[in-house]
Amino acid sequence: MSFLSYLISGISLGSIYAIIALGYTMVYGIARMLNFAHGDIIMVGGFAIFTMVSTLGMAPMVGILAAIVVCTVLGVTIEFVAYRPLRGASSLAVLITAIGVSYLLQNLALLIFGSNARQFTSVVTVPGLKLAGGRLSISGETIVTIVVCIVIMAGLTGFINKTKVGQAMLAVSEDRGAATLMGINVNRTIAITFAIGSALAAIAGALLCSTYPSLTPYTGSMPGIKAFVAAVFGGIGSIPGALIGGIILGVVENLSKAYISSQLSDAIVFSLLIIILLVRPTGILGKKINEKV
């Protein structure tokens, strides 16, 4: 496998991290909280698609749409039941609640589906490409993942900058009190943010499980943590930062597996986080804020 192959597959992995990181960065940017249950919503999306496609025999696209609906409803429910009552609470209380929700989702999946890994059937039907006389192979999953990431980033940027709901999100992220005085329903805006983030988690789950087709109740844990690292690296609260952080993280992880050690790749990724926090605590594109996480 050539350097270019590792680079392209790293960009593909980074695109998945970027899509997941968007959920972290949107929720933090608007609600000023870290939803550490976000990675487990990815797992829920994966199991929803698995159930729809492999168990019920539905078409892959129908399974993906169903998973998006399931994850969206789940995300809004979590926000309403677990996080909204803690709106004025300390960051520590919110953090502990988020960790509790994460364990709850994992254990529910363990109870329903068991601990054995399920073989996930790829929902990608796009054929791969062979370039450079067949020396460079790009899988259909890689192509779809990169394209979907670009479309999501462009669409989400346009949505936030061009729509009333997006403008409301920007207003709430800047000053929640002033947004309330302007007549913006803050609770509804935050709920919409959770809905969008959870829908993106479902899409990320489909892409992740298609690329790495082993599904367990803990499938979303490590990708969720790495996506959080990507969000912090790029500047949590920044949509372009999520993309930059995700791509850099994916490429670094893939190249370190190829040329250094697959066992040390995670250590290298987290070392990168420590370095960026020491050099630039707000991340590459992050802005300094007054609140503490």
Regions inferred by a protein language model and the residue ranges of each:
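Membrane-interfacial amphipathic/re-entrant helices at transmembrane-helix boundaries
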Residues: 1-20, 48, 60-63, 89-93, ...
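Membrane-embedded helix boundary and interhelical linker motif in transport proteins
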Residues: 8, 30-77, 81, 86, ...
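Helix-loop-helix "hairpin" substructures at the membrane interface of multi-pass membrane proteins
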Residues: 13, 135-215, 239-245
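Transmembrane alpha-helical segments in multi-pass inner-membrane proteins
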Residues: 17, 57-69, 194-271
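Transmembrane helix-bundle core of multi-pass membrane transporters
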Residues: 86, 91-162, 189, 255, ...
